[in-house]
């Protein structure tokens, strides 16, 4: 995978190539959707499928209200959803952990579309842009920077918004965003869904250089989508990422501790 003329030949000659991330290093998948919004399976079905794949944990991160086409959750429904997720987690008796989360929309001005009171109840808050993709670079950059300043955001979802062969990445100063995310203790996502593969390998390498953790997720809307993790692993390997660079290569307890350690 290391064939982009980024120092791999010199490293190989010095026997200094790193042990790159592997599929077996991933302990959980923390971006997925259920029938509560636009997914096709229940919380329990997603958890059972993840357990079959050998994962230690998942996070259920259904959409928030601004994405109306997905039947996104408002504050009241989100609180009910948290309750149900915790019930399923208890039913599974530790065989796999199921963390309550949300994929919250970043509005045009950088505000989030759920209240902080609700976000505070979530273990995993992913903030994502799903609208107004044509904002100028300076405006989009400021929008995303404002969003990740929210103290409850833990992961920036599909950070450039690209859909391969369908939509170009929006204009954003991704280096500034990644640098600030690193300072804040916010991870940036590599969305392994084949339509996205976002961040790209160049930006993943930049994140590694800036000390920003990566969360690799499948954005699954069906139990079968979890197998798409392998596509993302290939991109992480192209970017020289190791197990130490990846947030969800941590154990369940370490993962939660990392999320809760945000300054």
Please give the residue ranges for each predicted region.
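Charged catalytic cores and adjacent phosphate/nucleic-acid-binding surfaces used
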Residues: 1-34, 40-60, 65-96, 108-263
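Active-site catalytic microenvironments in core metabolic enzymes, especially phosphate/sugar-handling
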Residues: 101-104, 231
């Amino acid at each position: 995978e290391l064939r982009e003329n980024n120092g791999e030949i010199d490293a190989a000659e010095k026997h200094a190539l790193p042990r790159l991330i592997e599929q077996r290093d991933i302990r959980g998948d923390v971006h997925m959707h259920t029938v509560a919004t636009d997914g096709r399976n229940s919380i329990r079905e997603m958890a059972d499928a993840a357990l079959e794949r050998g994962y230690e944990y998942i996070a259920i991160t259904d959409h928030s209200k601004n994405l109306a086409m997905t039947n996104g959750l408002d504050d009241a429904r989100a609180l009910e959803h948290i309750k149900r997720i915790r019930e399923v987690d208890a039913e599974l008796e530790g065989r796999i952990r199921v963390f309550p989360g949300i994929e919250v929309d970043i509005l045009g001005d950088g505000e989030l579309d759920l209240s902080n009171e609700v976000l505070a109840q979530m273990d995993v808050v992913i903030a994502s842009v799903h609208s107004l993709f044509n904002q100028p670079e300076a405006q989009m950059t400021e929008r995303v920077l404002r969003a990740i300043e929210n103290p409850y955001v833990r992961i920036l979802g599909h950070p450039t918004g690209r859909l391969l062969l369908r939509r170009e990445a929006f204009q954003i100063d991704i280096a500034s965003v990644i640098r600030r995310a690193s300072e804040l203790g916010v991870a940036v996502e590599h969305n392994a869904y084949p339509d996205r593969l976002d961040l790209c390998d160049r930006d993943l390498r930049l994140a590694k250089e800036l000390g920003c953790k990566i969360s690799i997720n499948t954005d699954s809307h069906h139990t079968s989508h979890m197998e798409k993790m392998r596509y993302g692993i290939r991109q992480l390997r192209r970017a020289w990422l190791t197990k130490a660079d990846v947030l969800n290569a941590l154990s369940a307890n370490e993962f939660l501790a990392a999320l809760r350690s945000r300054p």
